[in-house]
Amino acid sequence: MKTYRSESLFAEARSLFPGGVNSPVRAFRAVGGAPRFIARGEGAFLVDVDGNRYIDYVLSWGPLILGHAHPNVVAAIAEQAAHGTSFGAPTELESELARLITQAMPSVEMVRFVSSGTEAAMSALRLARAATRRDKVIKFAGCYHGHFDGFLVQAGSGVATLGLPDSPGVTAATAASTLTAPYNDLDAVESLLKANPGEVAAIAVEPVAGNMGLVLPQPGFLEGLRRLADEHGALLIFDEVMTGFRVGYGGAQGKYGITPDLTCLGKVIGGGLPAAAYGGRRDLMELIAPAGPVYQAGTLSGNPLAMAAGAATLRAIRAPGVFEQLERAAAMLCSGFEHAAAEADIALRTAYAGSMWGFFFTDEPVVDYVSAKKSDTQRYAQFFHAMLERGIYLAPAQFEASFVSLAHSDALIQETIAAAADALRSIQNAARKG
C-alpha cells in the first residue's frame, strides 16, 4: 500500500499544527505511523491522497450515519449555500431542526443550538449550576464531555489515548468542583452525594460510554442515576453528543426509557457540519439569555448550512426500519469479530448499541474505565495496521467507539469480518513464531 503522499503531507503539517493535526486522536499516536490524509468520502468508503480506498468505521467520529456525501445532505447544503452561508440572524431552518429534535426526544422541551459538543456540555453545566445554585458536578472516569475545564478531569477519548489523567491548565479550584465516580457504580455516586450534601448541581453521564471504547450501561445504572439525582436535588445531564440519533432515533434516553433534565447533542444533528445543542425542561431552558440571566452566545450557533444538513439527515433516519438495519450491522460485526478472535485463539470482547460498536483485546468483562484500560493496546495497534493494510479504516486508538452507517451493506460487513479473521490469524501466527 502506497502512503508517500500522506507521509509527505504529515511532515509538512507538523510544522503548521501542534502534532501535525487539529484534534489529537488523528495523529495515530496510539497506534504508530503516519495518519492517512483523506481526499474524499464515498458512501461507506474513504479514499486517501495516495488513492487507497478503505471501508470506514470512524465516519468522522460519528456524525455520518448516512455515510459520506449522501445525496440528500449534499443537495441540502448546496441549496442553502446558494442563498448564503451565515447571517447572524434567526432562520426558519433552526426551527425546523429544533422541531425534529423535540419530537424525537420528549425530555427536550426547548433547545439552544451551539457549534460543538464542548459548548453544549459546558453550557448545560453552567445552566445546572445556576438553576440549583450549587457548584459541584459528578462525572464518570473515562467519560468525555469535551475539552471544557470543568469536565477535563479523568476524561476519556484523546485524553485517555494520550495517557493524561488531567490536563495542565485546569486550575485546582476547577478540578475540586468536579467529582469523579467509576462508570456503572451507583454506590460510588451515592457516596459522593452523601459526602457533599446540598453541593452537587448535576450528575453528567454518557448514557452509553463511547470515549473509553464502547462500554454499555449495566441494568439499573441509568435508572439509579435518575433516582439519586431526584433524591439529592441534583439535575441529571445526559451527554448524548455521541448517542443522540445513533443508538436509536430517540437517543439513549429513548432506548433505555430514562428522562434526563438536560441533554447535550451533536455529531449526527449537524449532518457532518459543525453543530451541537443542549436542551431540556422548559423551566430550565428559559433561564438562558435573553429569556433569563444565564448567558451563552455564539457567532455561528444555528448556522444555516449545518441546520440544513442536520435536518436532511434526521428526516432520512426517521424512516421505518432504519435503526433495525443499523443495529443488525453492528451486531453482525461484533459476532463476526468474536468468532474470528476465537478461531485465532485471541481474547476479545465486543459490545454494540444501535449503530455504535466496539471491541477490546481482553478476556474480562468491560464495565468501566479500569476494566477498559486492561485491554491490550499493543495488540490493538497491530490489529489496526493489519486492518488498514486490508482496506479497513478503524479508530486509530483503542479508547474510541466505532460506527456503522446506512451505506454499510451486508457485503461490506462480511468483507470486514473476513479481513478481521485474516488479520487476527496473521497476528497470532507472528506471535507464535516469536
Swiss-Prot record:
GO terms for cellular component: cytoplasm. Its cofactor is pyridoxal 5'-phosphate. It is an enzyme of class 5 (isomerase). Keywords: Chlorophyll biosynthesis, Cytoplasm, Isomerase, Porphyrin biosynthesis, Pyridoxal phosphate. CDD domains: OAT_like. NCBIfam families: hemL (TIGR00713), PRK00062.1 (NF000818). This is Glutamate-1-semialdehyde 2,1-aminomutase. It comes from Roseiflexus castenholzii (strain DSM 13941 / HLO8).
